[in-house]
């Protein structure tokens, strides 16, 4: 995605405080970054492929022995992800296009969690998703952060941000205009900040 390739978005810092340049998608994955894109159907999934195939995309190379996939490992990872993410599907072999929007998004989140990232970037991760799936996805993100990892959550849904985030950074016209901790935030405060009124 352009987010990975762009050079004008600022520096990325590892925990040791050293900045580094993202050189491509594979380098980003190997560096512990994962992106949940806004458009899951165009950028997050290969719709004609199975649930299983989608779930292993980021770790495909790690599941090969020579030129062949280790089918038992693939099946185990897919079944575990389907269970962990509560993906409703008849089979791990079901094409992704047959699933509901909420279950498709769970595949996208699940496949990137399979890559064991240290930083998860989520761009409107619950757009067009049913209420139950929204809650499940947000819970998974909070579990991820609870493992001493980081998530950057981008959303136009203020209530969703409040339920999902511990720290809030508001950008306006390309600049940071406000930052808040969870204890400081309310819907009204965040709404005013977004409108550049505080």
What role is predicted for each listed range?
Residues 134-147:
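Helical segment within the ABC ATPase nucleotide-binding domain
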Residues 1-13:
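Single conserved hydrophobic/aromatic residue that forms the stacking wall/gate
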Residues 167, 179:
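Short, glycine/charged-rich "phosphate-handling" switch motifs in NTP-dependent
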Residues 114-118, 124:
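A short, proline-enriched helix->beta-strand linker immediately N-terminal to the Walker B motif
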């Amino acid at each position: 995605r352009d987010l990975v390739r762009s050079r004008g978005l600022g520096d990325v810092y590892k925990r040791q405080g050293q900045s580094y340049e993202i050189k491509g998608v594979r380098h980003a994955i190997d560096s512990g970054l994962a992106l949940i894109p806004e458009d899951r159907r165009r950028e997050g999934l290969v719709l004609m492929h199975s649930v299983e195939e989608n779930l292993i995309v980021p770790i495909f190379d790690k599941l090969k022995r020579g030129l062949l996939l280790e089918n038992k490992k693939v099946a185990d990872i897919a079944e575990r992800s389907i269970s962990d993410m509560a993906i409703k599907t008849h089979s791990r072999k079901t094409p992704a296009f047959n699933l509901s929007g909420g279950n498709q998004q769970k595949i996208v989140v699940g496949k990137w969690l399979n890559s064991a990232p240290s930083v998860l970037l989520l761009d409107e991760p619950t757009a067009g998703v049913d209420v139950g799936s929204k809650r499940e996805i947000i819970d998974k993100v909070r579990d991820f952060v609870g493992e001493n990892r980081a998530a950057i959550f981008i959303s136009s849904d203020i209530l969703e941000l409040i339920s999902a985030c511990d720290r809030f950074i508001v950008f306006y016209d390309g600049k940071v205009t406000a930052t808040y901790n969870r204890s400081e935030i309310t819907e009204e405060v965040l709404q005013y900040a977004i409108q550049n009124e505080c």
